[in-house]
Amino acid sequence: MTVTIYHNPACGTSRNTLAMIRNAGIEPTVVEYLKNPPSRAELEAMIAAAGLTVRQAIREKGTPFAELGLGDPSRSDEELLDAMLEHPILINRPFVVAPLGTRLCRPSEVVLDILPDTHKGPFSKEDGEAVLDAGGKRIV
């Protein structure tokens, strides 16, 4: 199974998502999107496949969102995409692309919806929150 995660190693949600993928016995393709951003076509395809609008896929916190005036509702999807490609930190994360679907995995356990049920035992997030029980079954 080919799974790709658009990952930011500085983000706890992204790290937890990556760990859950690996807990399912899958070694994903890891794209550090701040260093290697997706193309416009890839970004548009991910957003559409996840069932999101461009505005729903943009990250506000810790980004130049406000200073670029991206909260203005008159800004078009094209303008938002341009900003996301120029400033990849504006791309919300982590996006995961898998044969079972594409999701923006916030919260991280959303990734479980698009992974096979092959989890190995219990799993807890970095903060200690239990996500999978000893049998690999979802708790949350």
From Swiss-Prot:
It is an enzyme of class 1 (oxidoreductase). It comes from Rhizobium meliloti (strain 1021) (Ensifer meliloti). Its EC number is 1.20.4.1. Involved in resistance to arsenate. Catalyzes the reduction of arsenate [As(V)] to arsenite [As(III)]. The resulting arsenite is then extruded from the cell via the aquaglyceroporin AqpS. Does not display antimonate reductase activity. GO terms for biological process: response to arsenic-containing substance. This is Arsenate reductase. The active site is at residue 11. Pfam families: ArsC. It catalyses: [glutaredoxin]-dithiol + arsenate + glutathione + H(+) = glutathionyl-S-S-[glutaredoxin] + arsenite + H2O.
